Amino acid sequence: MFLDRITIELRAGKGGNGVVAWRKEKYLPKGGPYGGNGGVGGSIIIESATHVYSFESYRNIRFLKAEDGQAGATNNRSGRNGKDLVLVVPEGTLLRDVETQEILYDFTKDGERLVICRGGKGGKGNTFFKTSTNRAPTKATPGKPGEVRQVEFELKLIADIGLVGFPNAGKSTLFNTLARTEVRVGAYPFTTLQPVLGLVPCQEKLYQKPWIIADIPGIIEGAHQNRGLGLDFLKHIERTRLLLFVIDICGCERSSPEEDLRILIDELLHYKENLADKSRIIALNKIDDLLPDERQERLESFQRLFPSEKFVLLSGLTGEGVDLLNSLFTNRLAI
Protein backbone atom coordinates (compact mmCIF):
# COMPACT_ATOMS: atom_id res chain seq x y z
CA MET A 1 0.00 0.00 0.00
CA PHE A 2 1.21 3.50 -0.89
CA LEU A 3 2.34 5.09 2.38
CA ASP A 4 1.43 8.79 2.43
CA ARG A 5 0.83 9.42 6.15
CA ILE A 6 2.90 8.41 9.19
CA THR A 7 3.33 9.50 12.79
CA ILE A 8 6.71 9.22 14.50
CA GLU A 9 7.97 10.32 17.90
CA LEU A 10 11.23 12.19 17.32
CA ARG A 11 13.81 12.58 20.08
CA ALA A 12 16.95 14.68 19.72
CA GLY A 13 20.05 13.49 21.56
CA LYS A 14 20.75 14.37 25.18
CA GLY A 15 23.74 16.58 25.92
CA GLY A 16 26.73 14.85 27.52
CA ASN A 17 27.45 15.43 31.20
CA GLY A 18 30.21 17.72 32.38
CA VAL A 19 32.79 16.04 34.63
CA VAL A 20 34.73 16.82 37.76
CA ALA A 21 38.43 16.15 37.25
CA TRP A 22 41.71 17.48 38.61
CA ARG A 23 45.01 18.30 37.09
CA LYS A 24 47.53 15.73 38.34
CA GLU A 25 51.14 16.29 37.42
CA LYS A 26 54.37 15.49 39.24
CA TYR A 27 55.32 19.07 40.00
CA LEU A 28 51.76 20.32 40.54
CA PRO A 29 50.54 18.48 43.65
CA LYS A 30 47.77 21.01 44.07
CA GLY A 31 46.66 21.18 40.43
CA GLY A 32 43.41 22.91 39.70
CA PRO A 33 40.15 21.75 38.10
CA TYR A 34 40.56 19.93 34.80
CA GLY A 35 37.08 18.60 33.91
CA GLY A 36 35.71 19.17 30.41
CA ASN A 37 32.24 19.98 29.14
CA GLY A 38 29.83 17.45 27.70
CA GLY A 39 29.14 17.29 23.95
CA VAL A 40 25.97 18.62 22.35
CA GLY A 41 23.28 16.05 21.57
CA GLY A 42 22.52 15.28 17.94
CA SER A 43 19.61 17.09 16.32
CA ILE A 44 16.95 15.61 14.04
CA ILE A 45 16.81 17.20 10.59
CA ILE A 46 14.15 16.69 7.91
CA GLU A 47 15.30 17.06 4.29
CA SER A 48 13.22 16.88 1.11
CA ALA A 49 14.41 15.05 -2.01
CA THR A 50 12.98 14.50 -5.49
CA HIS A 51 14.17 10.87 -5.65
CA VAL A 52 11.92 9.86 -2.71
CA TYR A 53 8.24 9.28 -3.51
CA SER A 54 6.66 7.94 -0.32
CA PHE A 55 7.32 7.18 3.36
CA GLU A 56 7.97 3.51 2.64
CA SER A 57 11.39 3.55 4.32
CA TYR A 58 9.70 4.58 7.59
CA ARG A 59 6.99 1.93 7.52
CA ASN A 60 6.37 0.44 11.00
CA ILE A 61 8.74 2.97 12.62
CA ARG A 62 7.16 4.69 15.60
CA PHE A 63 10.21 6.15 17.34
CA LEU A 64 13.49 7.70 16.16
CA LYS A 65 16.30 9.16 18.25
CA ALA A 66 19.46 11.07 17.44
CA GLU A 67 22.76 10.21 19.14
CA ASP A 68 23.53 11.54 22.62
CA GLY A 69 26.51 13.78 23.23
CA GLN A 70 29.39 12.16 25.12
CA ALA A 71 30.49 13.17 28.59
CA GLY A 72 33.43 15.50 29.06
CA ALA A 73 36.84 14.15 30.00
CA THR A 74 39.92 15.10 31.98
CA ASN A 75 42.50 17.51 30.57
CA ASN A 76 39.63 19.93 29.85
CA ARG A 77 38.53 17.80 26.91
CA SER A 78 34.97 18.28 25.74
CA GLY A 79 32.86 15.24 24.92
CA ARG A 80 32.12 14.43 21.29
CA ASN A 81 28.92 15.91 19.90
CA GLY A 82 26.16 13.44 19.02
CA LYS A 83 25.59 12.77 15.33
CA ASP A 84 22.59 14.46 13.74
CA LEU A 85 19.86 12.19 12.39
CA VAL A 86 18.72 13.23 8.89
CA LEU A 87 15.34 11.98 7.65
CA VAL A 88 14.81 12.23 3.89
CA VAL A 89 11.20 12.78 2.78
CA PRO A 90 9.47 13.43 -0.56
CA GLU A 91 8.70 16.87 -1.92
CA GLY A 92 5.16 17.74 -0.90
CA THR A 93 5.60 16.56 2.69
CA LEU A 94 3.62 18.48 5.31
CA LEU A 95 4.77 18.27 8.94
CA ARG A 96 2.25 18.67 11.75
CA ASP A 97 2.74 18.66 15.52
CA VAL A 98 0.40 15.95 16.81
CA GLU A 99 -0.16 17.60 20.19
CA THR A 100 -0.90 21.16 19.01
CA GLN A 101 -1.94 20.38 15.40
CA GLU A 102 0.37 23.22 14.35
CA ILE A 103 1.74 22.93 10.82
CA LEU A 104 5.49 22.94 11.32
CA TYR A 105 6.68 23.04 7.71
CA ASP A 106 5.59 22.42 4.13
CA PHE A 107 8.32 21.00 1.88
CA THR A 108 7.68 22.15 -1.69
CA LYS A 109 11.21 22.09 -3.18
CA ASP A 110 14.10 19.69 -3.48
CA GLY A 111 16.81 20.04 -0.82
CA GLU A 112 14.85 21.98 1.80
CA ARG A 113 16.01 21.29 5.36
CA LEU A 114 14.40 21.82 8.76
CA VAL A 115 15.82 21.18 12.21
CA ILE A 116 12.72 19.66 13.77
CA CYS A 117 14.27 18.70 17.17
CA ARG A 118 17.41 20.33 18.53
CA GLY A 119 19.92 18.37 20.55
CA GLY A 120 20.43 19.16 24.22
CA LYS A 121 23.33 21.32 25.33
CA GLY A 122 26.27 19.66 27.00
CA GLY A 123 26.81 20.02 30.74
CA LYS A 124 29.67 22.08 32.16
CA GLY A 125 32.78 20.53 33.68
CA ASN A 126 34.26 21.85 36.92
CA THR A 127 36.85 23.93 35.05
CA PHE A 128 34.00 26.18 33.90
CA PHE A 129 33.18 27.09 37.51
CA LYS A 130 36.69 28.13 38.53
CA THR A 131 36.82 31.73 39.83
CA SER A 132 39.23 33.90 41.76
CA THR A 133 37.40 33.02 44.95
CA ASN A 134 36.68 29.37 44.14
CA ARG A 135 39.85 27.86 42.74
CA ALA A 136 38.85 24.23 43.33
CA PRO A 137 35.18 23.88 42.34
CA THR A 138 33.65 20.45 42.75
CA LYS A 139 30.59 21.28 40.70
CA ALA A 140 29.70 19.89 37.27
CA THR A 141 26.34 19.95 35.52
CA PRO A 142 24.48 17.24 33.59
CA GLY A 143 23.63 17.59 29.92
CA LYS A 144 20.27 18.97 28.90
CA PRO A 145 17.68 16.68 27.32
CA GLY A 146 17.03 17.01 23.59
CA GLU A 147 13.75 18.24 22.19
CA VAL A 148 10.97 15.68 21.80
CA ARG A 149 8.09 15.92 19.35
CA GLN A 150 5.32 13.67 18.09
CA VAL A 151 5.18 14.55 14.40
CA GLU A 152 2.71 13.60 11.68
CA PHE A 153 4.14 13.39 8.16
CA GLU A 154 1.56 13.84 5.41
CA LEU A 155 2.39 13.61 1.71
CA LYS A 156 0.64 15.58 -0.99
CA LEU A 157 2.27 14.51 -4.23
CA ILE A 158 3.93 17.17 -6.34
CA ALA A 159 3.54 16.37 -10.02
CA ASP A 160 3.23 18.29 -13.25
CA ILE A 161 0.19 16.32 -14.42
CA GLY A 162 -2.49 14.56 -12.38
CA LEU A 163 -4.74 11.95 -14.04
CA VAL A 164 -8.26 12.19 -12.62
CA GLY A 165 -11.22 10.02 -13.51
CA PHE A 166 -13.74 7.43 -12.46
CA PRO A 167 -12.70 3.80 -12.01
CA ASN A 168 -12.53 2.02 -15.37
CA ALA A 169 -12.13 5.26 -17.36
CA GLY A 170 -8.87 3.89 -18.77
CA LYS A 171 -6.53 6.08 -16.73
CA SER A 172 -3.93 3.39 -16.12
CA THR A 173 -3.84 2.36 -19.78
CA LEU A 174 -3.36 5.99 -20.80
CA PHE A 175 -0.75 6.41 -18.07
CA ASN A 176 1.19 3.44 -19.46
CA THR A 177 1.10 4.93 -22.95
CA LEU A 178 2.21 8.38 -21.80
CA ALA A 179 4.89 7.23 -19.36
CA ARG A 180 5.96 4.22 -21.44
CA THR A 181 5.64 1.92 -18.46
CA GLU A 182 3.45 -0.99 -17.37
CA VAL A 183 1.12 -0.25 -14.49
CA ARG A 184 -1.26 -3.13 -13.72
CA VAL A 185 -4.55 -2.67 -15.58
CA GLY A 186 -7.73 -4.71 -15.69
CA ALA A 187 -11.34 -4.68 -16.83
CA TYR A 188 -12.72 -4.00 -13.37
CA PRO A 189 -12.99 -0.93 -11.12
CA PHE A 190 -10.26 0.25 -8.76
CA THR A 191 -7.35 -1.43 -10.53
CA THR A 192 -5.20 1.46 -9.29
CA LEU A 193 -5.37 1.47 -5.49
CA GLN A 194 -2.49 3.84 -4.82
CA PRO A 195 -0.99 6.86 -6.60
CA VAL A 196 1.62 5.94 -9.22
CA LEU A 197 4.26 8.33 -10.58
CA GLY A 198 5.77 8.24 -14.04
CA LEU A 199 7.78 10.41 -16.42
CA VAL A 200 6.44 11.73 -19.72
CA PRO A 201 9.13 12.78 -22.22
CA CYS A 202 8.71 16.40 -23.26
CA GLN A 203 8.41 16.95 -27.01
CA GLU A 204 9.94 20.43 -26.74
CA LYS A 205 13.68 19.98 -27.41
CA LEU A 206 14.61 23.15 -25.54
CA TYR A 207 12.94 21.77 -22.41
CA GLN A 208 14.88 18.63 -21.51
CA LYS A 209 13.19 17.77 -18.21
CA PRO A 210 10.37 15.18 -18.53
CA TRP A 211 6.97 15.87 -17.03
CA ILE A 212 6.11 14.06 -13.79
CA ILE A 213 2.69 12.44 -14.13
CA ALA A 214 0.61 10.97 -11.29
CA ASP A 215 -2.07 8.33 -11.81
CA ILE A 216 -4.51 9.10 -8.99
CA PRO A 217 -6.79 6.21 -7.90
CA GLY A 218 -10.31 6.38 -9.30
CA ILE A 219 -12.60 9.05 -7.86
CA ILE A 220 -16.24 8.19 -7.11
CA GLU A 221 -19.25 10.40 -6.50
CA GLY A 222 -19.11 11.60 -2.90
CA ALA A 223 -15.30 11.50 -2.79
CA HIS A 224 -15.20 14.92 -1.10
CA GLN A 225 -17.14 13.30 1.77
CA ASN A 226 -14.44 10.59 1.91
CA ARG A 227 -16.47 7.93 0.11
CA GLY A 228 -14.08 5.35 -1.29
CA LEU A 229 -11.13 6.94 0.55
CA GLY A 230 -11.82 10.00 -1.59
CA LEU A 231 -10.07 12.52 0.67
CA ASP A 232 -6.90 10.44 0.68
CA PHE A 233 -6.91 10.53 -3.12
CA LEU A 234 -8.12 14.10 -3.69
CA LYS A 235 -5.34 15.64 -1.62
CA HIS A 236 -2.78 14.46 -4.19
CA ILE A 237 -4.48 16.59 -6.84
CA GLU A 238 -3.77 19.85 -5.00
CA ARG A 239 -0.07 20.03 -5.86
CA THR A 240 -0.31 19.22 -9.57
CA ARG A 241 0.23 21.96 -12.16
CA LEU A 242 -2.20 20.50 -14.69
CA LEU A 243 -5.20 18.19 -14.31
CA LEU A 244 -5.96 15.64 -17.02
CA PHE A 245 -9.56 14.48 -16.67
CA VAL A 246 -9.97 11.05 -18.28
CA ILE A 247 -13.53 10.30 -19.41
CA ASP A 248 -14.76 7.06 -20.97
CA ILE A 249 -16.40 8.54 -24.08
CA CYS A 250 -18.73 5.54 -24.29
CA GLY A 251 -20.03 6.10 -20.77
CA CYS A 252 -21.28 3.30 -18.54
CA GLU A 253 -24.54 1.79 -17.34
CA ARG A 254 -24.60 4.16 -14.38
CA SER A 255 -24.39 7.48 -16.25
CA SER A 256 -23.55 9.24 -19.49
CA PRO A 257 -19.98 10.44 -20.15
CA GLU A 258 -21.20 14.05 -19.95
CA GLU A 259 -22.63 13.36 -16.50
CA ASP A 260 -19.34 11.74 -15.45
CA LEU A 261 -17.48 14.95 -16.29
CA ARG A 262 -19.98 17.08 -14.41
CA ILE A 263 -19.64 14.90 -11.31
CA LEU A 264 -15.83 15.01 -11.45
CA ILE A 265 -15.81 18.80 -11.67
CA ASP A 266 -18.29 19.05 -8.79
CA GLU A 267 -16.24 16.69 -6.61
CA LEU A 268 -13.12 18.82 -7.03
CA LEU A 269 -14.97 22.06 -6.34
CA HIS A 270 -16.56 20.62 -3.20
CA TYR A 271 -13.14 19.50 -1.99
CA LYS A 272 -11.30 22.78 -2.70
CA GLU A 273 -12.87 25.70 -4.57
CA ASN A 274 -9.51 26.94 -5.83
CA LEU A 275 -9.12 23.75 -7.86
CA ALA A 276 -11.50 25.39 -10.35
CA ASP A 277 -8.67 27.73 -11.31
CA LYS A 278 -6.19 24.94 -12.02
CA SER A 279 -5.35 24.34 -15.67
CA ARG A 280 -7.03 21.22 -17.04
CA ILE A 281 -7.53 19.19 -20.20
CA ILE A 282 -10.39 16.74 -20.79
CA ALA A 283 -9.27 13.49 -22.46
CA LEU A 284 -12.20 11.71 -24.11
CA ASN A 285 -10.76 8.21 -23.95
CA LYS A 286 -11.59 4.88 -25.61
CA ILE A 287 -12.43 6.34 -29.03
CA ASP A 288 -11.30 3.01 -30.50
CA ASP A 289 -14.74 1.70 -29.46
CA LEU A 290 -16.55 4.23 -31.70
CA LEU A 291 -16.87 4.91 -35.41
CA PRO A 292 -15.46 8.25 -36.67
CA ASP A 293 -18.93 9.83 -37.00
CA GLU A 294 -19.85 8.74 -33.48
CA ARG A 295 -16.66 10.27 -32.09
CA GLN A 296 -17.46 13.63 -33.64
CA GLU A 297 -21.04 13.57 -32.36
CA ARG A 298 -19.85 12.88 -28.80
CA LEU A 299 -17.21 15.63 -29.02
CA GLU A 300 -19.78 18.18 -30.20
CA SER A 301 -22.09 17.18 -27.35
CA PHE A 302 -19.34 17.85 -24.80
CA GLN A 303 -18.44 21.16 -26.43
CA ARG A 304 -22.05 22.36 -26.23
CA LEU A 305 -22.36 21.46 -22.55
CA PHE A 306 -18.87 22.56 -21.49
CA PRO A 307 -17.88 25.36 -23.91
CA SER A 308 -14.93 26.60 -21.83
CA GLU A 309 -13.15 23.24 -21.61
CA LYS A 310 -10.37 21.89 -23.84
CA PHE A 311 -11.16 18.41 -25.18
CA VAL A 312 -8.91 15.81 -26.82
CA LEU A 313 -10.16 12.67 -28.53
CA LEU A 314 -7.80 9.78 -27.88
CA SER A 315 -7.29 6.11 -27.19
CA GLY A 316 -4.91 5.09 -24.44
CA LEU A 317 -5.01 1.57 -25.88
CA THR A 318 -4.00 2.36 -29.48
CA GLY A 319 -2.15 5.62 -28.84
CA GLU A 320 -4.35 7.61 -31.24
CA GLY A 321 -4.47 11.28 -30.19
CA VAL A 322 -1.62 10.95 -27.67
CA ASP A 323 0.78 13.08 -29.74
CA LEU A 324 -1.73 15.93 -29.71
CA LEU A 325 -2.10 15.53 -25.96
CA ASN A 326 1.68 15.73 -25.50
CA SER A 327 1.71 18.96 -27.52
CA LEU A 328 -0.91 20.41 -25.19
CA PHE A 329 1.22 19.44 -22.19
CA THR A 330 4.10 21.41 -23.69
CA ASN A 331 1.91 24.45 -24.37
CA ARG A 332 0.55 24.46 -20.82
CA LEU A 333 3.65 23.48 -18.86
CA ALA A 334 6.77 24.65 -20.70
CA ILE A 335 6.72 28.15 -19.28
Curated annotation (Swiss-Prot):
According to the UniProt entry, its GO molecular function terms are: GTP binding; GTPase activity; magnesium ion binding
Cofactor field: Mg(2+)
Residue ranges of the OBG-type G domain? Answer: 159-334
Enzyme class of the recorded protein, top EC level: hydrolase
**Matches recorded under Pfam families:** GTP1_OBG, MMR_HSR1
Localization per Swiss-Prot or TrEMBL = Cytoplasm
Enzyme Commission code: 3.6.5.-
- SUPFAM superfamilies registered for this protein in UniProt: Obg GTP-binding protein N-terminal domain, P-loop containing nucleoside triphosphate hydrolases
Q: Where does this chain mainly localize?
A: cytoplasm
InterPro entries given in the database record = G_OBG, GTP-bd, GTP-bd_Obg/CgtA, GTP1_OBG_dom, GTP1_OBG_dom_sf, OBG_GTPase, P-loop_NTPase
User: What positions does the domain Obg occupy?
Assistant: 1-158
Q: Might you report a single GO cellular component term?
A: cytoplasm
Q: Does the keyword GTP-binding apply?
A: yes
Partners and quaternary state? Monomer.
Please state what the protein is called: GTPase Obg
- Organism, as annotated: Chlamydia felis (strain Fe/C-56) (Chlamydophila felis)
